[in-house]
Design a protein with these regions (language model features):
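ABC ATPase NBD coupling module
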Residues: 71-85, 109, 115
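Conserved ABC ATPase signature
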Residues: 138-142, 146
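Helix-to-loop junction immediately C-terminal to a conserved catalytic motif
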Residues: 54
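H-loop/switch region of ABC-family ATPase nucleotide-binding domains
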Residues: 206-207
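The feature captures the beta-strand-to-loop junction immediately N-terminal to the Walker
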Residues: 39-41
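Helical segment within the ABC ATPase nucleotide-binding domain
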Residues: 185-197
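Catalytic Walker B motif of ABC-type/P-loop ATPase nucleotide-binding domains
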Residues: 165, 170-173
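Conserved ABC ATPase "signature" region
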Residues: 116-134
Length: 221
């Protein structure tokens, strides 16, 4: 996909939550291949931007386009929502499902591929984030770091309903908060590797200076 392809556009976008204006006439465009970092003090609306792109919130005013499509409905109300993938600070794995089932959850739900093909895709995604022989384990059998890697593997699963030209947007919300410097570096490397492997673009919200510097090629204040 050409680098000049616009993946996301916010135009004069504002968000009001009650009497509080969280975002005021934001203008932001993201192009294919970009890795953005959004920085600012607590309460400045960084996570609100992620919620908008994820389809969990609608703007009060202005426009939001993803892959050229106007976003007028919440994600759950769309028949074909945009390819947006979230990686939370908490891995958010389902404790009752194995690693294989957690990573392949979307594909199992869509029922497009056979179990054998889903398994192959899941194993490939796990290997890309450095995980081997864990597919049949449950989340509570893994270390915290391994659980986080599973959440990255899950973000590599492509929506079977999207075409080959679809450009996924990966959202990382405070991915290195509370980690020691060594763990921080590992996750930062994983953010870059995962975004490149998904052939997508990314937005990182973080207060950690090394994460901002290492994972972004453009910083939004």
């Amino acid at each position: 996909m050409p680098k000049n392809t616009q993946v996301m556009l916010m135009k004069d976008l504002s968000v009001e939550l009650g009497s509080n204006k969280v975002l005021d006439e934001v203008n932001l465009a993201m192009m294919a291949g970009e890795r953005l970092a959004i920085v600012g003090p607590s309460g400045s609306g960084k996570s609100t931007i992620l919620r908008l792109i994820a389809g969990l919130l609608l703007p009060s005013e202005g426009r939001l386009q993803i892959s050229g499509i106007e976003q007028n409905y919440l994600r759950l109300d769309q028949n074909s929502p945009p390819d947006v993938r979230l990686v939370f600070q908490n891995p958010a794995l389902l404790a009752s499902l194995t690693v294989r089932e957690n990573v392949g959850f979307l594909l199992e739900k869509q029922k497009v591929f056979s179990d054998a093909i889903i398994n192959k895709k899941v194993i490939k995604c796990l290997q890309k984030v450095g995980l081997y022989d864990v597919a049949d384990k449950f989340p509570n059998q893994l270390s915290g770091g391994m659980q986080k890697r599973v959440s990255f593997a899950r973000a590599l699963i492509s929506d079977s309903k999207k075409g080959k030209d679809s450009i996924p947007i990966l959202l990382y919300d405070e991915p290195t908060a509370g980690l020691d410097p060594i763990a921080c570096t590992r996750i930062e490397d994983l953010i870059i590797k995962t975004t490149e492997a998904a052939e997508g673009c990314s937005i990182v919200v973080s207060h950690v200076s090394s994460t901002i510097e290492r994972t972004a090629n453009r910083v939004i204040l």
